[in-house]
Curated annotation (Swiss-Prot):
The name this protein goes by in its record: Chromatin structure-remodeling complex protein RSC3
Gene3D superfamilies assigned to the protein according to its UniProt record, in alphabetical order: Zn(2)-C6 fungal-type DNA-binding domain
Keywords: Chromatin regulator, DNA-binding, Metal-binding, Nucleus, Phosphoprotein, Transcription, Transcription regulation, Zinc
Organism domain of life: Eukaryota
Summary of subunit composition and partner proteins: Forms a heteromer with RSC30. Interacts with LDB7 and NPL6. Component of the two forms of the RSC complex composed of at least either RSC1 or RSC2, and ARP7, ARP9, LDB7, NPL6, RSC3, RSC30, RSC4, RSC58, RSC6, RSC8, RSC9, SFH1, STH1, HTL1 and probably RTT102. The complexes interact with histone and histone variant components of centromeric chromatin. Component of a fungal-specific module (HTL1-LDB7-NPL6-RSC3-RSC30) within the RSC complex.
Organism of derivation: Saccharomyces cerevisiae (strain ATCC 204508 / S288c) (Baker's yeast)
Other remarks in the entry: Present with 1750 molecules/cell in log phase SD medium.
DNA-binding region per Swiss-Prot/TrEMBL record: 14-42
Matching PANTHER family: CHROMATIN STRUCTURE-REMODELING COMPLEX PROTEIN RSC3-RELATED, OLEATE-ACTIVATED TRANSCRIPTION FACTOR 1-RELATED
Gene: RSC3
Length: 885
């Protein structure tokens, strides 16, 4: 029984073996038994491999029997029966024919099985197509004498190889393809006859019609109707005629065509096409905006630079800031650029590795073990306990006195250490760096006694040297071309540290070359193995590789297909969140697709499925390591949801579908409230004490994205209230309803401004309890202060200008009704009160941002320097760095 439910008889035994009831080897023309007993009358009663109907699949058999492949098969068998007598007289030719026949049939059956074993999704696409078996390689032809049936020796081309076939999907059957090809050849032959003047007799050059005249007629009529429809639409959409076919004056004609409907009348409705990824800002406008980095990855759809180029309101903020710096801060800008270039020219790769003394290093490693208690689950490739004897072995011989100090430090010359020692020093470096980030990011592990405080200060002082060590180690590993499992473990741990501790919210400053994934594939860790240690290493690399790309909205291309990863999952953390990662990878496949138009309805459906998948995975996290690990999954999910919902807002705003815009806006505000609570609650959870380093920086990046999206909503609310107010002033009569409507719009934008300021206050309070400043948090506070000054400047000038004169701005807030404005205000107030109670915030309204943020002690929303958005010559460098981060 084959996979189609057909019973297939074995090739029958010869008549002599059947009479004697012995096993037959079915060799033609004479089987082994007949040859052994010298019986030359060996013959076979039936054709081998003939299909017979089965009781369970008679319908399937009838369908298959009518197919183009078996029809051609039976036709060839009729020819072979006529020559069977001749072939039996020639053993060599008969055996060759039999081998060719069996090979051809086997290749066809194998190809058919491969087609049937495809996934259901692929089958759904192929159901309406026909598979053509085209030879993918030409077998070698050798001129060799073959004895023919009449005993004469004739040189023939002997095929040296089986008939190899390749599957090619086509919307036509084989009969249709042959008919089209024959018509083409006949047409070329007619042209040759016309050119040469020679006529070929005995050849029918009439163009062959389709096998079904009725079908041909219906196709012809349908094609003619579609052609007329397309032609009429082209004239109409080009502005030559109207819908009734009447000509339109040339001055009123439209200069463009709807290319999709011209090509396919049944193309998807343009109101259902998701095309917001097409940049809304002109290329000239984007080129003027030098303030933001230009070397962004164009496939990073969840990146703020990518969003700015598609939202004219958000673009306006950065464009105004760009113009301000060009006109009023040109001098400080040139000084900053010159200083950067000087630092880059003087920077180099050190050939020395510096560490604290042996005793301090061992104490710090023990501190790591007591602080990061879940290190075995979260960082399975880092073994701190194994580093203690290595420190004891390597450090004593390289310890020296510090100049002008009684303290000791350990120095290694790079050229004098072996490859194994180099990797061990790399693990020690990363262990100390992760320990610093762990102690600095938590506010729940205070350093009360002097001994621990002094130890932390020593670690902080060595921070630049440890980062320099990391750069030197990476350069030396590449220089020595080291490629083994231990090197891979170090590279993967370094990539993890780079991902979780990156102080930039953009991928523009650090190019990810996926060194860990490429080396792992080179060492074949992505294929099934029995080595448990190798499997754990691969699971760790796979998870972090997907995290890095999914957070930025990129497709993890190297792992986007199932055949690239056959290694089993034994890491319980990856096993828990694999389904969510796999779903997000498939989502990126669809969003990054270049060969199809994206559907708005499908994206909305995928968003709902993503939400349900995240809930399922989160509910499965029951242990502390799984909960900590799931925080990164949740951050990737929330970051994706924020961007997708905001892109939908832009899409419906462009289509002027205000009902859908308001619906998505409600979902976005609810998601924003949940995200703010999620981020700040994780930073104050005692369960995560010492492990905040795994998610703190990505949490701040999500907060920064949300703040800029809130700014874009504020600009829309401000623009709609300003235009409504201007319309009321121009109108001779203003009713109470319009005034109330405008007051609600003003109230909404004020609440959005209040939410942004409250986020800054919470971040400021968090930094007060940190041991040292977090650069990413500091930059976000600076951004919020700049945004606050920008908002005050808008309120004072009350000017609404377009960010791009070539682009007509639609404002989704202008289509919100009065009832919806009340509901919107309620949602915004819930977000505001969930952060800080407004009464308490008003008491602290004039408090200053701690730790010298912006280089001044100005209040968060003070009126100082609002005309320059808070920029001064003193704080220009800090603000410029924060805006570009």
């Amino acid at each position: 029984m084959d996979i189609r439910g057909r019973k297939m008889k074995k090739p029958p035994a010869c008549v002599q073996c059947r009479k004697r009831k012995i096993g037959c080897d079915r060799v033609k023309p004479i089987c082994g038994n007949c040859m052994k007993h010298n019986k030359m009358d060996c013959f076979y009663p039936d054709v081998p491999g003939q299909y017979v109907p089965s009781s369970s699949s008679s319908s399937n058999t009838r369908q298959v029997a009518n197919g183009p492949y078996l029809n051609s098969y039976y036709a060839s068998r009729r020819v072979s029966k006529e020559t069977a007598a001749l072939l039996q007289k020639n053993p060599e030719l008969a055996s060759l024919e039999q081998i060719r026949e069996y090979n051809t049939r086997l290749q066809l059956l194998n190809a058919q099985n491969q087609l049937n074993n495809r996934s259901s999704a692929a089958n759904a696409t192929l159901n309406q197509q026909h598979t053509q078996y085209i030879p993918k390689s030409v077998p070698s032809l050798e001129s060799k004498p073959v004895t023919s049936a009449n005993e004469s020796s004739t040189p023939l081309n002997w095929v040296q190889g089986p008939a190899i076939f390749h599957m090619l999907t086509s919307p036509y059957t084989q009969d249709e393809i042959i008919n089209h090809e024959m018509n083409f050849l006949k047409g070329r032959l007619l042209e040759l006859q016309e050119i040469t003047g020679k006529k070929i007799t005995g050849v029918n050059l009439d163009l062959k019609q389709d096998s079904s005249a009725q079908m041909q007629s219906s196709h012809s009529n349908r094609n003619q109707e579609e052609f007329l429809t397309i032609k009429k639409r082209k004239l109409s959409e080009d502005g030559v005629t109207d819908g009734d076919g009447k000509p339109i004056p040339e001055s009123e004609r439209r200069p463009h065509l709807n290319e999709f409907k011209d090509l396919d009348p049944q193309f998807l409705d343009t109101n259902k096409v998701f095309n917001v990824f097409n940049s809304a800002i002109s290329e000239e406008g984007r080129n003027r905006l030098w303030l933001l980095p230009k070397n962004i990855n164009k496939s990073s759809i969840f990146q703020i630079q990518y969003l700015i180029e598609r939202d004219p309101f958000l673009f306006k903020f950065f464009n105004d800031l760009n113009i301000l710096i060009e006109t009023q801060f040109n001098g400080p800008l040139h000084d900053l650029v010159a200083s950067r270039n000087s630092i880059e020219r003087n920077s180099g790769i050190s050939q020395i590795l510096k560490f604290p003394s042996q005793s301090i290093t061992q104490t710090l490693i023990n501190k790591y073990l007591s602080t990061i208690t879940e290190t075995n689950s979260i960082l399975p490739i880092l073994k701190p306990k194994r580093l203690l004897p290595i420190v004891e072995q390597l450090f004593p011989s390289n310890t020296i006195n510090k100049p002008n100090s009684k303290d000791f430090e350990t120095i290694f010359q790079v050229f004098s250490v072996t490859n194994d020692q180099l990797l061990n020093l790399g693990f020690i470096t990363l262990c100390l760096l992760i320990l610093f980030e762990s102690l600095n990011s938590t506010v729940l592990i205070p350093l009360r006694d002097d001994e621990h405080l002094q130890l932390f200060n020593v670690l902080f002082n060595y921070l630049p040297l440890l980062k320099s060590n990391l750069t030197t180690l990476r350069f030396e590993i590449e220089k020595r071309s080291m490629c083994n499992i231990e090197t891979l473990r170090f590279i993967s741990l370094w990539k993890y540290y780079q991902f979780v501790m990156d102080t930039s919210s953009s991928s523009s400053f650090v190019i990810d070359y996926d060194e860990d994934m490429h080396m792992a594939c080179l060492l074949s860790l992505n294929h099934e193995t029995q080595n448990q240690s190798h499997i754990l290493t691969w699971n760790f690399i796979f998870k972090n590789y997907c995290w890095r790309h999914l957070f930025l909205g990129q497709l993890p291309l190297l792992m986007s297909e199932p055949f690239t990863n056959s290694t089993p999952i034994i890491d319980p953390l990856l096993n828990n969140d694999f389904e969510l990662i796999d779903f997000e990878v498939n989502l990126m496949k669809y969003l990054q697709s270049k060969d199809q138009q994206l559907s708005i309805d499908k994206i909305i459906q995928l968003i709902k499925l993503l939400k349900n998948k995240n809930i399922e995975v989160s509910q499965g996290c029951l242990t502390t390591p799984s909960i900590i690990n799931n925080i990164m999954d949740s951050l990737i999910y929330r970051n994706s949801m924020l961007y997708l919902n905001f892109y939908l807002l832009l899409q419906f705003e462009t289509l002027k579908n205000y009902a859908k815009f308001n619906e998505i806006l409600e979902d976005f505000l609810e998601l924003s409230r949940e995200t703010l609570f999620f981020v700040f609650s994780n930073l104050a959870n005692i369960k995560f004490a010492g492990h905040e380093f795994t998610f703190i920086n990505k949490s701040i990046v999500v907060l920064q994205t949300l703040v800029l999206m809130l700014l874009a909503l504020y600009q829309r609310s401000f623009d709609s209230s300003k235009r409504t107010n201007d319309a009321n002033e121009i109108s001779e009569q203003t009713d109470i309803h319009s005034n109330n409507d405008n007051s609600k719009r003003i109230k909404n934008k004020n609440v959005i401004h209040l939410i942004i300021n409250k986020i800054a206050m919470l971040l400021s309070d968090y930094t007060k309890n940190c041991k040292k400043q977090n650069k990413l948090i500091e930059n976000l506070i600076i951004k919020i202060k700049t945004i606050s000054k920008y908002i005050k400047n808008l309120e004072e000038n009350k000017v609404t200008t377009s960010a791009d004169s070539n682009y007509s701005i639609n404002n989704g807030f202008s289509g919100i009704s009065a009832e919806q404005l009340i509901k919107l205000n309620h949602e915004l107030s819930k977000i505001s009160e969930s952060l800080i109670k407004t009464d308490f915030y008003e008491q602290r309204k004039n408090s200053t941002v701690s730790n010298g943020v912006l280089g001044a002690a100005a209040p968060v929303d003070s009126d100082a320097n609002s005309d320059t958005f808070g920029l001064t010559k003193e704080n220009f460098n800090e603000v410029f760095e924060a805006i570009r981060s």
